[in-house]
Amino acid sequence: MASSVFNSRANNFPGLSAKASPFFGEHSSPAISLADFSGGFDGDMYSQLPSMSLPLSEYVKLITKTMTVSPPGYPNHRRLVLTDDIKRLMRRVLALMPDPETNNIFFFKLKANNVFVDLLSGKPFLHAASWTANYDVNLARMNYARVGEMFRQTIFSGAVASLPADFQQLLSLMKTNGDTASYAIQHHCSLIWRVDKKELFTRIYDFSNDILQKWNYMSYTDIMNSLHFPANWDTLIQQNPYLTMLYRGSTYYPNAGKEVLRFKRNAYIHCLQYAWDMATKQKIYDQADMGEMLETALSLVLHSFQLELDKRGLLRHIRLESLYL
């Protein structure tokens, strides 16, 4: 598979070998990206390899990884969040992993020192990684587990306990479910940019409410009954004055999972109603701030929503790829 690509690379870089391993169907590549498996090859990236790239462990030192935010309405609360720059990098590293649910490509002994980042484009690529085209469920699971360990140790030096709860759930998912939850991992809510979180939630909500509920009511009901959400979510909402105004604008039944989702949807859609102080003509918050307020009160609800859809093979139908470019 793609042997001509590997041979041409060996010719371009005499110091690198690209010969097949003694085992049928297994190969070694000096530098590969997901494009290799569809016959593509970005020559510019690899021509920069000797001098214009850094190992992942060095590149992350150039990036601000976290920042602290104070969601409006929570004067004494500060949240540590991931920066968009580090989210972009982790999304791109994940994009190097072929989808084990649709592709039979798997890597052997994937380590942090296999991952380099092009300094001009900021795109990561794999260097000297071995792969096989034979399906192996253990390798599928192991690939994502090892990438998760890269995130944990190489990027955050093991200090993940203070990081956002949804990101910790992503790491847990990568450790145990890489063979079955690849789409949920690649498009996880913890890696969405702050400004896109509303779009992510509303796409998932609208698919579930407008399509799935009519198409397969049993699956819809099963998902709603399986959602994890704070038992006192309505009380948590009313600890924030801006969320309280939105909560009081409708009637909600606190014991139903779908009501939590309905509140989040309404809060996103109508959040700008109370975003300005009419007396001072000053903006109080924007849609990204609303996302932080909702995450403070309703942590892990979106993670649970994504996961329950993915368990049933439904998350793919929403086509979230455009939000994770």
Predicted features by range, described:
Residues 33, 109, 118-184, 205-246, ...:
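C-lobe/activation-segment region of protein kinase-like
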Residues 6-13, 20:
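Long, polar low-complexity intrinsically disordered regions
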Residues 189:
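Phosphate/adenylate-binding glycine loop and adjacent helical scaffold
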Residues 88-119:
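Catalytic-loop of the protein kinase fold
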Residues 42, 53, 83-94, 141-144, ...:
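Generic preference for well-ordered alpha-helical elements
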Residues 15, 22-87:
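Conserved structural core of kinase catalytic domains
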